[in-house]
């Protein structure tokens, strides 16, 4: 019996690993931290393993460059643009790069992107890029992996790195620092992956491609829902905000963003003196909603059973359990993402019963990435964390309302009422006063049908 076995029998409640210095020196980064060695995996002797690095033709860091949200330059992938093992086609950031940089960092169909820097929870997020129609590049906290397809298909590598085993291998190599965690790509290459017959890898490839196809069809249907909404409001679906602003001036390209108000019309009425609040674009949106043919209402006129979350203590957190804690980072654009959640002790429910989630509830983020909204589509046992507005609604379709809340029509109202410095915050009272156009029931049904079909395909893709 070796020393490790002796210690484990004597102290079964401890994670212990005893190593020779010579064994530690074999590690490419000379790892001596306990988490690396105590999380070591057991391999199946019946399988053929290779190091990931032995199966790659190339690995490459992304480009470090300034980015913008104005659409100037080439779309650039960041850490949050990877979702459910796929690289999203719609990205928020762009970068001005020259031809040589584009040639160096342009993504190719079938490239695998690995997120080397993120929170401990999300580091190692991996997705495959399926686009050969447009130019995309990738940022420096991502790494491009190009597989030798005679040995390892990119779809299989992507799936493996997203499994429990793959994530454990990644996290044991993760190096925590202030507010983020990093994984050295050279250590990633040291991970051993079972090399299955190509026939099996091709089956995985087909499943991933079918998933991607269903997801793209889902996005097209959701886009149809958005187009139907904007057309109903008399806006151009291709650029709804610009079409609204252009309709308010005879010389749209040279219009100045100027708004003049008396003290009575401004501070004494709203309590706000900051110039940003009185930008003409916000007033144009408000006028458009107020003039909608079927009328308008305030959000509070549609709301039932409202709450704004509870500040649960980290002492109540658990890695596994039955009671899920919904945090702001779980709210995506119209989607509740439960892939990375933490749990609460069951008795935490008693701390704030009003913050228990029900199927059909709508959630809106109130801090940071403000105004993100989704519908709770399933029966789940969950509580909402602080700074999340939760409510049920009446006399309006929940999917259509969430579409409105995530559109520029409501996003810019949230932007206008936001307060704070480094992190923007929303008041639940101010949020309930935003304006909502009262879309007629026939149009709501049409929009809701597109959305339901979209989410059915999204569910199929998973």
Give residue ranges: language-model regions:
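Glycine-rich, acidic and aromatic/proline-enriched surface loops and short helix-turn segments
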Residues: 163-166, 407
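A structural connector/turn signal
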Residues: 101-102, 178, 351-352, 378, ...
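A short glycine-rich beta-alpha junction/loop motif
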Residues: 135-143, 175-199, 382-389, 420-443
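Short coil/turn segments at secondary-structure boundaries
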Residues: 65-73, 172-174, 240-245, 312-321, ...
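A short beta-sheet element
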Residues: 78, 105, 109, 113-160, ...
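Sequence-specific dsDNA recognition surfaces
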Residues: 49-65, 80-111, 297-314, 329-359
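Elongated alpha-helical scaffolds
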Residues: 105-112, 137-139, 152, 185-186, ...
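Non-catalytic DNA-recognition/assembly elements of restriction-modification systems
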Residues: 1-63, 197-310, 440-462
């Amino acid at each position: 019996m070796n020393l490790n076995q002796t210690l484990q029998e004597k102290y079964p409640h401890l994670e212990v690993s005893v190593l020779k210095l010579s064994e530690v020196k074999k590690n490419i980064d000379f790892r001596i931290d306990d988490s690396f060695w105590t999380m070591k995996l057991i391999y199946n002797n019946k399988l053929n393993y290779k190091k990931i690095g032995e199966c790659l033709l190339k690995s490459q860091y992304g480009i470090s460059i300034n980015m913008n949200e104005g659409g100037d330059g080439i779309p650039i992938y960041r850490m949050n643009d990877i979702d459910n093992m796929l690289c999203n086609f719609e990205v928020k950031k762009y970068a001005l790069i020259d031809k040589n940089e584009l040639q160096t960092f342009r993504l190719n169909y079938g490239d695998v992107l690995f997120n080397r820097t993120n929170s401990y929870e999300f580091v190692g997020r991996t997705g495959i890029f399926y686009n050969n129609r447009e130019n995309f590049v990738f940022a420096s906290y991502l790494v491009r992996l190009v597989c030798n397809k005679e040995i390892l298909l990119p779809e299989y590598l992507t799936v493996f790195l997203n499994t429990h085993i793959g994530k454990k291998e990644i996290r044991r190599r993760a190096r925590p620092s202030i507010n983020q965690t990093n994984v050295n790509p050279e250590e990633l290459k040291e991970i051993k992956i079972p090399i299955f017959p190509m026939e099996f890898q091709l089956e995985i490839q087909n499943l991933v491609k079918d998933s991607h196809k269903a997801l793209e069809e889902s996005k097209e249907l959701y886009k149809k829902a958005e187009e139907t909404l904007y057309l109903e409001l008399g806006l151009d679906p291709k650029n709804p905000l610009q079409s609204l602003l252009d309709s308010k001036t005879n010389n749209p390209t040279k219009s100045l963003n100027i708004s003049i108000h008396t003290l009575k019309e401004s501070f004494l009425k709203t309590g706000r003196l900051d110039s940003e609040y009185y930008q003409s674009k916000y007033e144009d949106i408000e006028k458009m909603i107020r003039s909608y043919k079927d009328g308008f209402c305030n959000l509070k006129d549609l709301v039932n059973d409202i709450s704004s979350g509870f500040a649960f203590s980290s002492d109540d957190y658990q890695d596994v359990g039955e009671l899920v804690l919904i945090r702001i980072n779980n709210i995506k654009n119209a989607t509740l993402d439960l892939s990375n959640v933490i749990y609460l002790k069951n008795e935490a429910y008693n701390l704030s019963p009003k913050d228990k989630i029900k199927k059909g509830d709508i959630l809106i983020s109130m801090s940071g990435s403000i105004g993100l909204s989704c519908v709770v589509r399933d029966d789940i046992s969950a509580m909402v964390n602080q700074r999340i507005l939760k409510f049920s609604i009446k006399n309006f379709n929940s999917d259509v309302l969430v579409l409105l809340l995530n559109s520029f029509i409501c996003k810019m109202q949230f932007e206008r009422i936001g307060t704070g410095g480094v992190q923007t915050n929303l008041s639940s009272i101010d949020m309930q006063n935003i304006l909502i156009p009262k879309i007629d029931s026939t149009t709501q049904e049409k929009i809701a049908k597109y959305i339901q079909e979209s989410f059915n395909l999204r569910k199929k893709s998973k």
